[in-house]
Amino acid sequence: MMKFFSTRDHDHIVTASQAIAQGLSDEGGLFVPERFPQVDVRALCQLDYPTLAAAVVSEYLTDYSKDFLAEATRTTYGEAFGGKAGYLAPVEGDTYALELWHGPTCAFKDYALQLMPKLLVEAKKNLSRTEKTLILVATSGDTGKGALDGYHDIPGVEIAVFYPTGGTSEIQRLQMATQEGANVAVYAVRGNFDDAQTGVKRVFGDKAIAAKLAERNIRLSSANSINWGRLVPQIVYYFAAYAQLLKAGKITFGDEVDFCVPTGNFGDILAGYYAKQMGLPVGRLVCASNQNNVLTDFLSTGTYTAKREFYKTTSPSMDILVSSNLERLLYHVTGSDAEVAGLMKNLNETGSYTVRPETLAAIRESFDCGWSSEEQVAGEIRARYEKDGYLCDTHTAVAFHVAAQKKRDGVPMVVLSTASPFKFPRSVLEALGHTAPENDFEAMQALEEATGRTAPASLAALRQKAERFSTVIDPAGIAEVALGYQA
């Protein structure tokens, strides 16, 4: 049985079901597995995506039945992904794009957030829990819609999503504001993503709020990547990318493959670290940042400084200064809950921390880094389209730019393409040298005409949908929202 414990308290031990149902540990730590399971990579590479997902996920979720996981992954990664779950597209030479935006909401978050509601419902069954689950989600754009789509009308669950007002693309905002479902709510928060995320974390850490909700038979949980249930499905597509390179004869088994990941909250790239620790021949994990390059600075110097200027960029899902999942990596590298707790205390109190030189050296064994300016992002979108005929969004362009700097001769580079270019039509259109209309839907149409590509139907359909949610609150209001729920 795989056990999980908190990054800040090694003695706080839970099962996978408990980790997924609870989300965050009581003292604010994140749940991590006690060990990295070793797998038969060659055998896994023979499997189709749903079967591969069941095999990888079952290594960690050992208190779930294998039959349940097989059925859950089969129903999740089939029709909804249009036959393109974990699809690897050749771009140029031995650089590839792992297209993770063929799911229902056109972003990589679908891989976790379409499966995670099934995992939560089953976790409650495993634990014989009957309370209502209130899920609070802070989002910089894609997680919000992914979570709303996954959890809407799930029995026994209520979900409230908080996004920074003006901090997403208009398409991302409309995806959330038009969400259907009787159990969903969406709020714009004054401030940036970190304000929203801090507000949500504060509610999770408030024992008085938990007690009041418990009186009404309500328990809090998270759908952000601080929840283990968000992270584990993302490990799968690293194996899928490697398998496709094998099948295409681009590598022989055992060859290393590098991955470049556009990174905000550090969850997507951390999943690659887990894949590597499980035995997948991952070479370098390249962390690509936008102008909010706090992670590039940390991976270069060992000092994490969240107190810095915040930039609103064309890649809003990465406009993050407090990168939550880095805490998990720090735990795995140091092995010390006390050390991690101390670092997080420093971050909370002073806005920064510095790791020991040997800790940074251990991290650099697996990770590299780089960042892209706004000008470089636009140039990369245009270059990829004009040179390779490859149309990408702003976040993917951040990674393509960094990947080109970090490419090793003879080692394939897989860039994780995290969102459809049609989620950010104005930015992509302008990067291609066109004047973008103010309206996102007109821009979407213009992008279709300019490139001959078709926008995903779910995005085009937003134009006809009525907006349901328009409330704007201060970060302090997140607690009031939580306390407003009744069983």
Positions of the model-derived regions?
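PLP-dependent amino-acid enzyme catalytic core
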Residues: 1-487
